[in-house]
Amino acid sequence: GSKANNDGVLDMAKKSIVLLKNDKNLLPLKKSGQKIALIGALANDKNSPLGSWRLAADDNSAVSVLEGMQQYKDNKLTYEKGADLTIEKATFLNELVFNTTDRSGFDAAKKVAANADVVVMVLGENGFQTGEARSRTNLDLPGLQQELLEEIYKVNPNIVLVLNNGRPLALPWAAKNIPTIVE
């Protein structure tokens, strides 16, 4: 696309972000002097933000949350995946198989969370989960994400939950316990 089109899309994306709650005033993040743990496979995903309804977007052409947060160099940012969302690489044609067993990254994620002032967790759906013929039987966080969220909360409750999803999600535990949620 042209620069004008790209600028317009960026403006729409910025305006589509909704602050659902900010009970501890964790947002806005400080521009300097803050230790931030960034956790979640979707935080380093350049494809899912494009969604499955994109027409001509190049794969992996979005700016990931990790890349965006790295722009603020006066904070100490540490990233840990915590757990893979899917077992195999997701594509439009593949059936998505979610990771429900590999918790090997939980300890590293808990360690960085325990040493942070604030934890930003990017959770939700893979971009290829929504779209034609992509119905779900429940609206919970897929894979191990709910378990990861609860484990991180035990070591640091100062969590900003950033949701990446193409449909409503059922998040009763997060709504009750997580102080800041952005969608």
Task: Report the location of each language-model feature.
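C-terminal non-catalytic regions of proteins with extracellular/luminal or membrane-system context
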Residues: 3, 7-183
